[in-house]
Amino acid sequence: MRSRGFLFQYTPMLERILFRLPAVLLACAALVHSNALAADAVEVRRTEGLMHGFLVLQNLQGKTLADGEMTQVARGDRVTDNLIFRFQDGSVYEDKTTFSQHRKFRLLSDHVVQRGPSFKHPMETSIDASSGQVTVRYKDDDGKEKVLSQRVELPPDVSNGLLFTLVKDVQPNVPRTTVSMVAATPKPRLIKLLIVPQGQEPLSIGKLQHKATHYIVRAEIGGVAGLLAHLLGKQPPDTHVWVLGGEAPAFVKSEGPLYQGGPIWRIQLAGAGQF
């Protein structure tokens, strides 16, 4: 591998270093940028409730990779979301999130499982927001199972598993909204997410014409870590989310990585099934 006139010998050790580089960058970002952006939990403009929907996950060329299903059950001001994708190659991604919605959205717990050939590194992450306990189970480069468990001081705006919910309540006329997220690198690191509205775009559903608000969700990495990420091409890609506005906002589509270091995938509402 050649870079700027220097010759590097590509070895297994170098491969392991390159794989771990995104984790190092995020770790630096957490230290350098932990207090750079003020953040607060998103206010509840419309309460969540009972829901059962179907999704499709595709690559950007339109090939279907997985079928998805999302359910939502509310008990009082406590809501549980369960999102699952079943891939054609047998892989599974599941995210179960519980949160409260008394004036502001507050994460209570989040449990994510990703396994199968669609994921380079199988991983299971559990977050207990009340105690700050974060547990990550994963396999290292040699295939050995590892467990990391630590307490993290989680802010009220931690948003793991809540992105599709929060964007429906973000004010589209606010220049940007900042929330926090625990990134499993695999060591748990607290980072910031910027949610920036990009304006409205036309949306057609058959003969019906609507407008959807386009949001960009960006992982904020500043300082030296951000510069290194840019130079080395390791800057986390933006996630794009489209939300149907009005009195009953609804998720329409997203384009972004489903997991750290993953490819850009498109998630959108599935068409009606056949009876």
Q: How should these model regions be labeled?
A:
Residues R4-L7, N35-A36:
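Compositionally biased regions
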Residues G5, P12, G222-G226:
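Coil-to-alpha-helix initiation sites in intrinsically disordered, low-complexity, charged segments
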Residues F6-L25:
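Bacterial N-terminal signal peptides that target proteins for export
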Residues A39-S131, R176-F275:
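Acidic, serine/threonine-rich low-complexity disordered tracts
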Residues V136-D141, P263:
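Compositionally biased, intrinsically disordered linkers/stalks adjacent to structured regions
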Residues K139-P175:
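Surface-exposed beta-loop interaction hotspot
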